[in-house]
Amino acid sequence: MGRVRTKTVKKAARVIIEKYYTRLDNDFHTNKRVCEEIAIIPSKKLRNKIAGYVTHLMKRIQRGPVRGISIKLQEEERERRDNYVPEVSALDQEIIEVDPDTKEMLKLLDFGSLSNLQVTQPTVGMNFKTPRGAV
């Protein structure tokens, strides 16, 4: 099993990533040199632990946002996604096909007056697997 990382290592790595994200990489040796240049770390062992955790977090950041780390690039990307407005509205189509349940939901949301709604029967026969032991 691996070792438990102390809060000192985790906090230092998070701060380093937030401030020096552009200089860091997925390579431990590169991150070790960057940590050595930018921070005063008292021991070689602690520096290596911090660099290792920085490398670990950088790999996680590549896959998606990481809790506790706010990077300007990720913040801008999130803003762009939140402010996205489609060029053509989904309601501006000539015919919108909905099933009866969706039609009822639209009525409850005061969208029942849309003229281009066409109620269609849902297709039966979806082959969903049932859990073992279910009747």
Curated annotation (Swiss-Prot):
Keywords: Cytoplasm, Isopeptide bond, Nucleus, Phosphoprotein, Ribonucleoprotein, Ribosomal protein, Ubl conjugation. The modification Phosphoserine is found at S113. It is found in: Cytoplasm; Nucleus, Nucleolus. The keyword Transcription does not apply. One of its GO terms (molecular function) is structural constituent of ribosome. The modification N6-succinyllysine is found at K19. GO terms for cellular component: cytosolic ribosome; nucleolus; small-subunit processome. Ubiquitinated at Lys-103 by RNF14 and RNF25 in response to ribosome collisions (ribosome stalling). There is a cross-link at K103 (Glycyl lysine isopeptide (Lys-Gly) (interchain with G-Cter in SUMO1)). Component of the small ribosomal subunit. Part of the small subunit (SSU) processome, composed of more than 70 proteins and the RNA chaperone small nucleolar RNA (snoRNA) U3. Belongs to the eukaryotic ribosomal protein eS17 family. Component of the small ribosomal subunit. The ribosome is a large ribonucleoprotein complex responsible for the synthesis of proteins in the cell. Part of the small subunit (SSU) processome, first precursor of the small eukaryotic ribosomal subunit. During the assembly of the SSU processome in the nucleolus, many ribosome biogenesis factors, an RNA chaperone and ribosomal proteins associate with the nascent pre-rRNA and work in concert to generate RNA folding, modifications, rearrangements and cleavage as well as targeted degradation of pre-ribosomal RNA by the RNA exosome. This is Small ribosomal subunit protein eS17. The lineage of its organism: Eukaryota, Metazoa, Chordata, Craniata, Vertebrata.
